Curated annotation (Swiss-Prot):
Disruption phenotype: Displays higher growth rate and higher sensitivity to superoxide and heat stress, on nonfermentable carbon sources. Leads to decreased intracellular oxidation upon heat shock. Under conditions of mitochondrial perturbation by antimycin A, displays increased peroxisomal proliferation. InterPro entries: ET-Flavoprotein_bsu_CS, ETF_a/b_N, ETF_b, ETF_beta_N, Rossmann-like_a/b/a_fold. Pfam families: ETF (PF01012). The modification N-acetylserine is found at S2. Present with 2400 molecules/cell in log phase SD medium. The electron transfer flavoprotein serves as a specific electron acceptor for several dehydrogenases, including five acyl-CoA dehydrogenases, glutaryl-CoA and sarcosine dehydrogenase. It transfers the electrons to the main mitochondrial respiratory chain via ETF-ubiquinone oxidoreductase (ETF dehydrogenase). GO terms for molecular function: electron transfer activity. It comes from Saccharomyces cerevisiae (strain ATCC 204508 / S288c). Keywords: Acetylation, Electron transport, FAD, Flavoprotein, Mitochondrion, Transport. One of its GO terms (cellular component) is mitochondrion. Belongs to the ETF beta-subunit/FixA family. This is Probable electron transfer flavoprotein subunit beta. Binds 1 FAD per dimer. Binds 1 AMP per subunit. Disulfide bonds: none annotated. The lineage of its organism: Eukaryota, Fungi, Dikarya, Ascomycota, Saccharomycotina.
């Protein structure tokens, strides 16, 4: 293992509407209703957090630090506290100053600055956020850093030669790739199952400090103004319930009614 680098892992996390909540379009038809709705960590990011902690637990001498960062409102402190309770070393909250829907490219640019500031050499992040499903922030970050990337990771291994082997899921099965650090890895659902955190650890995490940054003050060179505008949004049309048919003749009659035949 002499060829292995000390790992400084960065894990970006996002606060999103809880995955168990059915999203509803707001009254202005410009987005999702967020008032009175439960929020939690993006499930794919939670998997990235778990993987970072597991890597540290398996390779204590290999991991120098694990750091989680969230870009959003002050309310994102809750998910960062959860990260600390699970075992992440330190956290940063980058206040978006009222800008809730920062686009992926701007997020990637901010994360690039964080990587450079923290000296990170491995970024573990969810392959996508469940609110916008963009699935491109990790790729953009890797491009900006000029680092290799492994997306949709289902397994991550550190080889004795210092390289990282990632098994990723593709349409036809699995693909195994290798790369050298530094690199960006985006996580898929099958990578692991995040651990449950008990109340004592959550209470203890509340006493830990969270670094507070401000987009306007600490990243003034990055334009966070949206390049796209949501013109309108609507919920999918409700499908009519299915009908149980007892014979082929009934099926034919129903098809004739809807003029399918």
């Amino acid at each position: 293992m002499s060829a292995k680098q000390q790992l400084r892992i960065l894990v970006p996390v996002k606060r999103v509407v809880d995955f168990q909540i059915k999203p509803r379009v707001n009254k202005t038809l410009t987005g999702i209703e967020t008032s009175g709705i439960k929020f939690s960590i993006n499930p794919f990011d939670d998997i990235a957090v778990e993987e970072a902690i597991r890597i540290k637990e398996k390779n204590k001498s290999l991991v120098e630090s694990t750091h989680a960062v969230s870009i959003g409102s002050a309310k994102a402190q809750d998910i960062l506290r959860n990260c600390l309770a699970k075992g992440i070393d330190t956290c940063s909250l980058i206040d978006s100053v009222g800008k809730e829907n920062i686009e992926p490219l701007a997020i990637a640019k901010i994360l690039k600055a964080v990587v450079e500031k923290k000296g990170s050499n491995l970024v573990l992040m969810g392959k996508q956020a469940i609110d916008d499903d963009c699935n491109n922030t990790g790729q953009m970050l890797a491009g900006l850093l000029n680092w290799p990337q492994a997306t949709n990771a289902a397994k991550v291994e550190f080889l004795d030669n210092g390289r990282v082997q990632v098994t990723r899921e593709i349409d036809d099965g699995e693909e195994v790739i290798e790369a050298s650090l530094p690199m960006v890895i985006t996580t898929d659902l099958r990578l692991n199952t995040p651990r449950y955190v008990g109340l004592p650890k959550l209470m203890k995490a509340k006493k830990k400090p969270i670094e507070k940054l401000d987009i306007a003050k600490d990243f003034p060179e990055i334009n966070i103004e949206p390049q796209l505008k949501i013109v309108s949004m609507e919920e999918p049309k409700t499908k009519s319930p299915g009908v149980k048919l007892n014979s082929v003749d009934e099926l034919i009659e129903k098809l004739k009614e809807v003029k399918a035949i």
